[in-house]
Design a protein with these regions (language model features):
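Catalytic phosphate/metal-binding cores of nucleic-acid and nucleotide-processing enzymes, i.e., regions
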Residues: 1-124
């Protein structure tokens, strides 16, 4: 008979642990986005198609957001390039490494365009 491993005793390199950590990070980000975007949902819950396109949250227009909680390096350029977006969407990557604060990454052109709008409208 095959002996099953206890679920709570996952090794640090376990795929199940990494998956659970990623899902927990998505839930944490959603909780922080809710005051700004009350209709925000994870795409795992709301849209399998968006989840497959590398978009982790729905209801955050104009931003399309991917969340990554990683132990090793993340390649933001690759992740932002692989996100399948529509015209007018602004891709953003939230990524966190153990022991560090979460970082938001976006293309410089998108940042400049949005910051310019905020300055012109005297919001900043």
């Amino acid at each position: 008979m095959i002996k099953k491993r206890a679920r709570g005793n996952l090794s640090p390199n376990s795929g199940a642990k990494a998956r659970r950590k990623g899902h927990n990070f998505e839930r944490l980000i959603r909780k922080r986005l809710l005051p700004i975007y009350p209709k925000c949902q994870t795409s795992r819950y709301a849209s399998k198609m968006l989840d497959d396109n590398g978009i982790d949250f729905v209801g955050t227009y104009p931003f399309v957001i991917q969340a990554k909680h990683v132990e090793r390096g993340v390649n933001p350029q690759k992740i932002l390039s692989e996100m399948i977006i529509e015209k007018g969407d602004i891709p953003v990557l939230f990524h966190k490494k153990k022991g560090y604060r979460t970082i938001a990454t976006m293309w410089l052109d998108d940042w400049l365009e949005n910051t310019t709008k905020l300055v012109v409208e005297k919001i900043l």
